[in-house]
Swiss-Prot record:
This is Probable cytosol aminopeptidase. Its EC number is 3.4.11.1, 3.4.11.10. Its cofactor is Mn(2+). Mn(2+) 1 binds at D284, D361, E363. GO terms for molecular function: manganese ion binding; metalloaminopeptidase activity; peptidase activity. Presumably involved in the processing and regular turnover of intracellular proteins. Catalyzes the removal of unsubstituted N-terminal amino acids from various peptides. The gene is pepA. It comes from Streptomyces coelicolor (strain ATCC BAA-471 / A3(2) / M145). GO terms for cellular component: cytoplasm.
Amino acid sequence: MTALTLSTAAAPGLRADAIVIGVAKGAGGPSVAPGAEAVDKAYDGRLAAVLETLGASGAEGEVTKLPAPSGFKAPVVVAVGLGAEPEKDAGFDPEALRRAAGAAARALAGAKKAAFALPLAEAADAGVVAEGLLLGAYSFDAYKASAKEAKEAKGAKAKANGNGKAPLAEAALLGGKPRDKAYKAAIERATAVAEELNRARDLVNTPPNDLDPEAFAAVAQAAAKEHGIKVQVLDEKALVKGGYGGILGVGAGSASGPRLVKLSYTSPKAKKSLAFVGKGITYDSGGISLKPAGHNETMKCDMAGAAAVFAAVVAAARLGLEVNVTGWLALAENMPSGSATRPGDVLRMYSGKTVEVLNTDAEGRLVLADALWAASQDEPDAIIDVATLTGAMMLALGSRTYGIMANDDAFRSAVHEAAEESGEPAWPMPLPEHLRKGMDSPTADIANMGERMGGGLVAGLFLREFVGEGITWAHLDIAGPAFNEGGPFGYTPKGGTGTAVRTLVRVAELAAAGELG
């Protein structure tokens, strides 16, 4: 991962491959953002005019490269768009800074060192810039020959990106205060969160032949040991003994057995406890209700919820948050075979309720149901589950926004605010009571399907049935933004995105501070 430093050095004398500056979109054309004064001065105050001549407007995500002025030790200036120029005395939007830093980091793949002269009015700005560039520098090429060649050429720690270039090796943030505790803390937080989010991306991007439930559980065990997190793994025998019918039913058709992983981070100063529950379908074929052909290769991402939960728990431990956080990873592979669960089968869940399976491709809610009930037994102050659950949510909110449902409006609002503060687009969704009747079953206590319209909300209502009485709960349906099938943008790569990690970490921080809901 890119090495970060805070520097008080002046841009002209800094040895680097490039100087990154910000450009805002003003009413009369592009304007040079604070932090780039030395660069602008070297252009005799005409940098904005030069950029406009080159076609730059300051639009968000725009990247323009130009030769550095005479006397600069860095040969190139990289101007990144920050979007609309803020009003007088107002700072730049944190997400605009985050995305600009990410876009610059992507543009600088292959560079050894870059200096970022972006607006750092306060420590929080340093944190979001650091987070953006660390996330933007991410790449996943472990399975490419070009990656192996680049690794051998640049050393064991190098990791190539798609064009054979290693990610930006080092970044110096100019204008920060290296000795200021607030700045140091902001950088440390950004580093921990970004590293764990990138770990979640790695898991989502890993081919399913290398990441089955057992392999995922092993990754969690190794990380738990490294960071002092207690871990418990229930294998098939333990799941049978415990009566986890939902997880077992989903995994019944696969040669790779299911797992339920419990990660427990505890703080001696904690006054609150949270449980995060993640859907971890390491590959989703749909089971007997087989998915149609087309884009099935992306179904490796159906464990993105579990990856987000795993990353968030580890990040909480690394940050030493004063809150107890338990992560539940419900891991299974949904495959068709002679032993697979059939439409019409009835499963007895861990809670004791029975579920009639009308569609085996509505499997995520089955593994989550068992994990939610297991999490409820610890009586946490709140539970949040994360899942790539329904295509209906994608139709409702698109590919970049996830939906939030909850059994408490105030808690739903608090989670939504945490998502916004983290830079993760989300939207509150209802749980209409009239939709519950559609899941009535003549055979079992409830069916795993209901009305076709409002399918994302129906799924939320199903999950609510398995949350312990009196426990505050929220459900994040991340089906849209969990996997980016388009081109990279800002700090978001193609493939796994790590959606919801930052929201969960922010929720944990708020709980630790006694400010959640």
